[in-house]
Amino acid sequence: PEYSSAASDVYKRQREGGSNFPSYTPIVAGGSNACILHYIENNKTIKESDLVLVDAGCEYDYYASDITRTFPISGKFSAEQKAIYEVVLEAHKKSTEAIIVGNSCMNPQKTSEEVISQGLKDLGFLKEPLEEILEKKLFREFYYHKIGHWIGLDVHDDSPYTYKDEEIKFKENMIMTIEPGIYIN
């Protein structure tokens, strides 16, 4: 089943890194289950052609971490899977580069939306002009969550990107996850 395929490796790596326990129960989703946000069943059989999504975290020194990654169970992407993976990887890289002290905390989100929208258009999933895709948020059919969240004493520290209609600026030592995704069932 999904959970047993990755959970023991996740726990092993957490302990090797100095953590004694997870910050939440890992999500391990194969195939179409990976398109369900916060999927909790974790009990389906994974097929050789499936992608597997692992969303896991651990606590270290009272701080909770979180990371999501997707990989082919066979070890090799199909051509279609690779094309989508590369768009998500580019969104990850560009969004990470957008985290600069003094810049808006909205920059990584906006960057991920732009990169993913262009990628979905290039791959033929969206046909509209890029400006329309972004303005109408048409990408939300495939990318329906935020780029990430703050890391802190809770898994999802309650820290918005804006305050009183003003965008919050990055400060030194602020930490957030960067977890873009494209979900195609």
Question: Model-predicted segments: where are they?
Answer:
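Active-site neighborhoods and metal-handling regions in enzymes and metal-associated proteins
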Residues: 5-185
